[in-house]
Amino acid sequence: MWAADLDGGKPHRARAREAQRWVHLRPGDDRTLVLDHPAVLVQRTTAPEQPRRLLPAELDESCLEEWGGQVVVENHVNVLRKVEPESPLTARLLVALLASDALDRLYRCLTGSVAVSAYELAAIPLPEPSTLLTWANYDDTRLAQEIESYYRAQT
């Protein structure tokens, strides 16, 4: 999966990368290179002229099935996985947060670089778990409004 496959919020097959869709895996490579569980993917590098720095996409179960049950993610893609099963921060909420104009503006304040590092993603202040639990019940439109309001109030 290439970074170009992530624009638009959902992974897709960018035609420009079709000729490069091959990789030779050696024994043991699957432990580190193959992604076979849902995750949130974020482009790791952007061009200065791009209007956004944070370009997330949710790799959910149905998307994984569409891609054959597993993908190899190239090095210009950050892979964000849920490490605390009880966390109220779902993939849907994380994608909505990262796709918001508010977080994109905040991220630009944290860094002047066009690169999106895992370290800087981890530094983004997130709402309290109780807020996330409330947001989980909202439809996409209301969720986007709540995210904008929340971060506007924080500044």
Q: Where in the sequence are the language-model features?
A:
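Polybasic, glycine- and aromatic-enriched phosphate-binding surface used to engage nucleic acids
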Residues: M1-L133, D140-Q154
